[in-house]
């Protein structure tokens, strides 16, 4: 027997005796979503309770995860102080975009909101404030007729009652399913901000991930104070 054949026999026997690796152990380790969080930027793995306690900021690289409107409200407003404005406002599919109603209904169920923004009145450390929170989980918080109208009405309410406005922006831009109507919201919201400013009102704009497109080009960039998360 040649020496090469001997090594071949030993190799085949060794490979045959290796225990099979379960499919669940191949590749990346699956992380239970309710227990651990894996940072998409640096790959660090932390306990979810620690991640949540840190306002969903990675302790290793300071990556900011996107928050829901409920999480943002809980972090900002005094407990049980929030009263929603225009709670029943919903889109009527103004240009008849195919299956738009079905997509909206699905987002409403998933995100517990009628459209991509929640507006209302609350207190922040005791100070009465009009607040708006955009949620990127709802259609990437794109600005359509409902979002624009709710923002405009929030500023009008603040102007009428001499209140400051804090707006948390997060948007992928205009909502294509509503066509030109979505672009009109840029002028509408900017006009409402201007009237609030002319009346002496304070407006704080907090830009969060992602703030892009028509939202950036309109009310998000018009704050007396602009903060970027």
Indicate where each model-derived feature is located.
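Terminal-region recognition feature
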Residues: 1-204, 210, 222
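Gly/Ser-rich catalytic serine loop of serine hydrolases
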Residues: 208-218
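Gly/Pro- and small hydrophobic-enriched strand-loop and loop-to-helix capping segments
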Residues: 223-229
């Amino acid at each position: 027997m040649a020496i090469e054949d001997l090594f071949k026999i030993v190799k085949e026997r060794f490979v045959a005796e290796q225990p099979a690796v379960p499919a669940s152990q191949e590749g990346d380790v699956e992380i239970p979503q309710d227990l651990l969080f894996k940072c998409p930027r640096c790959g660090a793995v932390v306990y979810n309770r620690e991640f949540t306690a840190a306002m969903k900021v990675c302790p290793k690289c300071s990556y900011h995860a996107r928050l829901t409107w409920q999480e943002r409200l809980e972090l900002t407003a005094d407990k049980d102080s929030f009263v929603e404005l225009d709670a029943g406002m919903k889109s009527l599919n103004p240009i008849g975009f195919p299956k738009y109603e079905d997509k909206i209904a699905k987002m409403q169920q998933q995100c517990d909101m009628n459209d991509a923004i929640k507006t209302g009145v609350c207190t922040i450390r005791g100070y009465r404030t009009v607040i708006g929170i955009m949620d990127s989980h709802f259609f990437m918080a794109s600005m359509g007729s409902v979002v624009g109208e709710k923002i405009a009405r929030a500023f009008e309410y603040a102007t009428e009652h001499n209140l400051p406005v804090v707006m948390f922006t997060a948007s992928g831009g205009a909502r294509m399913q509503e066509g030109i109507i979505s672009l009109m919201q840029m002028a509408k919201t900017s006009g409402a901000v201007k009237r609030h400013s002319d009346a002496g009102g304070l407006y704080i704009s907090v830009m969060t991930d992602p703030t892009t497109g028509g939202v950036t080009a309109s009310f998000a960039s018009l704050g007396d104070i602009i903060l970027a998360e």
